[in-house]
Structure formats: C-alpha cells, structure tokens
Amino acid sequence: MPSFRPNISNDLDTIIFECNSNYDTIVEVTKWFLQIAYLIPGGILNILLLYTILFKNSEIYASSSFFLIYSTDCFVSFSMIFLDIIGRTLVYFTPLCPIIAPMFYEPLIGFKIMMIVLHHSRACKSLIQILLVVNRMSCVIYPIRYGKMWMRPLKYLIILVFVIPFSIDWNLIISRVYMQPTFGGIYMEYIKKVAWASQSRFQLIFITIALLFTIVCTSVIFYTLVMLPKRLRNVERTLSLGTAYISMSFIILVVFQFLFAFYSDIFTTSTIFGYSLLSYDILNVGSPIIMHCVSSKLRNHVLRGSRKLSSAARVVPVSNVTSTNGWVNLIVITL
C-alpha cells in the first residue's frame, strides 16, 4: 500500500484523508481485541509491581537499587501501554475510522503531545535497560560495595533517564503532527522540520547503545558466575533467562528501528509497522511477566499482598554481606 503524502503549504493547513476500506473489518477488529487482551493485563501488572516496590512493600525493596530502577521501568512501560491502547484502537478498530476521521483534519495538539511522550518513553526504556544491566554486572563484580556504590548516585541517574531523551524530542516538538491512513484505521505521523533529524534514527542510536551494554554486561556476568561454586548454578540459570529475554527483545527492536530509520518510505504503512509495535509490546508486557516468574518473593507480595517477610525474604543490608553467601544474596535480591 503506498504511503500517504500530505500536501500542505504551512503547518496550519488542513490535511484531509480517507480511511482505507480494503481491510477486512472482522480481521482488523480481531487484531485489536487480541492486542488489547494482553496490553491491559500487562499494564495492570506493571502498576502492581510499581505499587508493590514503591509503596506497599517499600521497606523491603527501597534498599535495592535494582528494584528502584525496575520500578522506573514499570512506570515508563505503563505509560507506553496506556498510549498504545489508544493508538491500537485508532489503527485496528476500523468501524471508528469513518466516524472520527474528520476530527483529525486540523493540526493535532493532543496527539502531538501523545507522540512526543511515546517517543520520549521509548528512549527512556533504552536508558533504563543500560542501568539494569550495569547494575547487575556491578552486583556480581563488587558484591560488598554494590549497595552503597549505587544508592548514592541513583536518584540522579533516574532523573537523567527522563532528562536525556529531551535531546531527541526537539524536532518532533517543532514539527506538524497529523493523522494518516494506517491499515484500516489511522495513526500519528509527523512532517519533519529538519529532514535529517528522524525520530527512528534517534531511537536506533539509543537502542543500539543499550544493546551493546546488554551484550557486554551480560557476558561479564556469565563469566563471573561460571567461576562461582557449583551450588550457585541455579542463580546463573535464573539470570540467564532474564538476560536472554532482554537481549532478544533489543535485537528485535534494533531490526525494526533500522528498517524505519533507513527504509521508512517503503515500510511506514506496511505490515512491518504492526510488527514494530509488537516489538515494543515484548518489552513492555514481557518484562514484568519475566520478573514475576523469576522473583518468587516479589510474586508473593504482588499476589498475596503480604506486608510481612519471613527471614528468608528480607533484603540483606550491604554491611551484613560477606564472602560468597553475600554474593548470592545480592544476586537473588536483584532478581
């Protein structure tokens, strides 16, 4: 299907489009239903994890830099899922398109903000990923100093997670955002004021850096854990599951961001657009599921709502951690 090309002389011109009626309504609505069926539970799970870590059981998790970083990821993931639910409804719930299309001919302020927040959040995800893998690596390399080493600069690092992505928002802020026909519905697009400053290329830079950090840090983690005694192999297996998932997710993201960055004219309105949306779903929905599976203590707190910990569940202060046992405790806490 050819790309939609708006023909305007200034940013205030009306952009008129028609919904594509070639798509089967039943098929498109089924796509919408299937995606909403996992996006809503995924959003709820992110909120539950965020609430458990920061509020309900904060006395347990507030001493773990890993969980504080991960709670930031839960917040960003929920924000993206919330916006994605709106976006997927516009794209796939095709009966709405002919009804609401005339509402989107004029310049879009609300959806421009939505698009900025969505791209900003995607960059945040890459930065959070870097913090998570570096945090885990430092945990196994410096088990004694790990806690103090992270807690001091952590609040500044989290602030930077939200501040740094503003460096790539500027072109989107000054550009015209409009709706274009996408599948049987509509979706947001923008007319770049600065031609070279593509959001997809900016995102590709962030994601590629995050992927490199993931590969290097997890390689160091695996090498270090292999050196541990045999009785600690269960920890290695659990960590392998999480890191393998993260690596796979970012490889998928890199592939789709590469296609959009350099072949956007070909792929913007094709099926690959839908796959690119799903690639972020893998991160936003899959990540809390993985965390829910690998951390039995966190899972119990989320599901059972218990505020009390047995001695085995309590986070061990860094000052009390010694020798190999301390190493294991810190690794288990971060998982």
UniProtKB/Swiss-Prot annotation:
Cellular component per GO, a single term: membrane
GO BP annotation list: sensory perception of chemical stimulus
Keywords annotated in UniProt: Membrane, Transmembrane, Transmembrane helix
GO molecular function list: transmembrane signaling receptor activity
Keyword Cytoplasm: no
Coiled coil stretches, renumbered: none
Main localization, broad class: membrane
Keyword Nucleotide-binding on entry: no
Protein topology in the membrane: Multi-pass membrane protein
Membrane spanning stretches: 33-53, 66-86, 98-118, 154-174, 202-222, 242-262, 271-291
InterPro entries, A to Z: 7TM_GPCR_serpentine_rcpt_Srg, Nematode_SR-like
Localization of this protein: Membrane
Domain of life of the native organism: Eukaryota
Family per similarity comment: Belongs to the nematode receptor-like protein srg family.
Protein name in UniProt: Serpentine receptor class gamma-11
Protein species of origin: Caenorhabditis elegans
Gene: srg-11
